[in-house]
Amino acid sequence: MQKLHHAQGMSKETFLAFVLIGLVLGWISGTLLLTIDILFPGLVFVVLIYIAGKKGGKFLLIFLIPFVFSLAISGVLALLPIERGFKNIQGIIIETKANYFIMSNGIRRYYIYEKTTIREVGDIVSIKGYVSELSFTEYESKFSFEEYLRKMGVKEQINVSSIAAIFERPIRLRRKELLFLNNFDPLTKGTIDLLLFAKKDYSNETVALANTIGCLNILSGSGIVYAGFLRFCDTICSYRFKENQTKIIVFILAVFTIPLFLGKIGAYRVLILKSFDVFYVLSKKERSPYLFRLSLAGLILFFLNPFHSLNTGYLLGFGLAFYIFFNSSCFYYFKNKQKKFLKFLSLEYFLLPLFNIRGEFKLLAPLFTFIFLPFAYCFSFLSLLSFLSVPYESLLKFCSSFLNKSLVFIDKISLSIPLGDFPKWCVFLFYFAIFLALYFYDLGLTHFSKIGAFVQICSLLVPSLPVMAPYIQQVSFINVGQGDAILIRDGLTSVLLDCGGVLSFDLAQEVDIPFLRKEKIYKLDCLIASHSDYDHIGAKDSLTSKFSVQKFVTSKEEFPLTIGNLTFVNYNVYSGENVNEKSLVLSLNFMGKIFLFTGDADKNIEKQIIRDNPNLKADILKLGHHGSKTSSCKEFLEQISPEVCVISVGKNNKYGHPDKEVIKRLNELGLKYRRTDEEGTITYRRYFHQPLGDL
């Protein structure tokens, strides 16, 4: 098999591969131009310049010209100023989901919220509304919808006043999809939505279980389902038709069913490769090398939408295809069955980072992937037939129930290791080392190839080891949206003051626990509740059932409270009528600074505290009640005189926190303040008892 470095002269597959890599890397670099993440594509660029340079000037130019071209365009788009104000915008819809769609006017892309939208990709609309920068409530360690949109090139959102359709696509599948799903109970509906339409409703039990055990990406992989369906059709047709006839029939089926997978990059890749098969059959030309076809498919998708370069599905899908291509020579001397098994193991190895779910590495996820993949094919095929004909309610309900019960059983035996999330640089290093190892292996430099393999293992293993845990001291104001959760850590002693709480999802499972694992904390010595408000302690039951919590404290009588070397003093010793007046106000002398955590204590409590404690000061003040004007009176702020105030608050919250009056007061007093809705989790940390830096 011809590889890039073995190509004599400038073969067409080598040419396309270098052009594709240059375009994709250039687009990523331009988009990340003003961020620290530019270091990742920068390192790849340096290595590829070296490789291309070693091959000769032509290779260097073929890589550099597309790179610079792509970098220039994406850089300009990234630097475009944000639009604001009331506007009338026309554009084409390029993506639709259950409750929003993305529209492009040719230069900019806009997010538009629309409850239960039935719009289709390809519709052209005219929208009147107020344009502003993207702004969504974000949570620590949880999926960032805003980051996802920005990777798609979306920087603005439109608060719609009116929408007028200019052109509507004749085939209206979205409406049919909704009508079809309404025939089923919620559990079956969620399963069909996942396996056929690749939409993940995390409130659905099946979806949540699949995510927990680590096989959600496979079950929702529409490209995999699409390819599996076509492979099944290919097998059936091969019994009746000749090879070339089979390819044409399968391609017709692929074209017929692709509307079900619009917006799914994996499905597009499969369709393009199938179209190549038909082209070679009809033109009677010799089939081009796989590398040529794969690179050409990547280029077609890139030019259809350059922002695919930032899509995990695009990068992982083509990265996996290139990996399998270059990795095939490693199994050359094995027998057929051994070769298939080793290729499967190799595939699972490539997908290892995907098996880390919420900071837990799922040991059996590769096995579950192998088990459920055939089921995904069968269920998706039945769902597709049902969608195209009549609803098979009883059959699909039975299959959905079987899958759900299987997932419940497997969840009980699922083995996992709490490693914490893999940092971005670790995942990058893992994949970068894989391709370097393959490159060196093909060159015959097995020594360097082994070093690459060692780097791969270290990139995921070393950051997961809690070697620094005994030497870390930190206070983290965790971004739990509109609520409070504060981690105090002194080496191996960890205390959580409040844990937040929201009604829409399990905050402990999706925010608190993943954050603790990311910090290499696997038990809490104490959970303290400042008071009983749900936004402070609503996640407590879930947290204590899923994570090791040694002690739970909520009573004032337990203070002063000493946990390890940490001593908390409560200053709210007064009797209050409402729940906020009962909130603990805790002081902690730690890391050479005095912290004051005020919970939701109001002005009345603040005034009593400074009256009875005239010498009370603090370096870092957690502002009361999320910046509400019911707290943070002038007298309290003047006496406490903090170096910095921290406001734990959710973005775009319905209460208007922090209140403008409070912000004005802080500015008038010259007090610096930081907000979790703007910065995310705010952490003060030091190692080996070194002095704490700037606050």
For the regions a protein language model found, what residue spans apply to each?
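Cap/insert and terminal regions of metallo-dependent hydrolase folds
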Residues: 608-680
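Core dinuclear metal-dependent hydrolase active-site scaffold
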Residues: 306-309, 411, 418-526, 556-620, ...
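Hydrophobic alpha-helical transmembrane segments in multi-pass membrane proteins
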Residues: 18, 22-24, 28-37, 44-45, ...
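Active-site environment of divalent metal-dependent phosphoester hydrolases
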Residues: 226-227, 263-269, 309, 532-538, ...
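Aromatic-rich juxtamembrane segments at the membrane interface
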Residues: 4, 153-273, 278-282, 568, ...
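Membrane-interface amphipathic/re-entrant loop segments adjacent to transmembrane helices
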Residues: 356-376, 383-431
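Membrane-interface helix/helix-cap signal primarily in integral membrane proteins
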Residues: 2-9, 67-217, 509-519, 523, ...
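Active-site HxH/HxHxD metal-binding segment of metal-dependent hydrolases
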Residues: 526-528, 532-560, 642
